[in-house]
Amino acid sequence: MFRKLFKTFAIVLFLAGSFTGKVISSELTFFTIGTGGTAYTYYPVGGMIANAISKPPGSRECGKGGSCGVDGLIASAVSSRGSVDNVNAILSGLRNSGFAQSDVAYWAYTGTGTMKGKEPAKDLRTIAALFEEHIHL
């Protein structure tokens, strides 16, 4: 599990690197990550990702105890009711990103399953698979 989490952080940091550049203090970018309930796994993982990619103005330099994140980015993990809530929040513009189980993300992309009757979310993208999850009936 640690190996998958490490790979995820590496991917997120790589993707975040495309936003780098010097930032004037007035040029802040806020980035929200929809997670899950605060008592469950996804909320602290979202917090770790947010901390890894954030680098507000005035932060210590990377390598001197500071964040090596994206200059001017302030990311935050936001608790939610889970996958469907996160996908709906992304589609409405309330959140920038969020965790979703693969079946829910697929349904949103295709307009099927729990998202039947809604416009397919063809702009929805997967950044990484964090956990292997099995659904039991």
Show where each model-derived region lies.
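Sec-dependent N-terminal signal peptides of Gram-positive bacterial secreted proteins and lipoproteins
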Residues: A10-F19
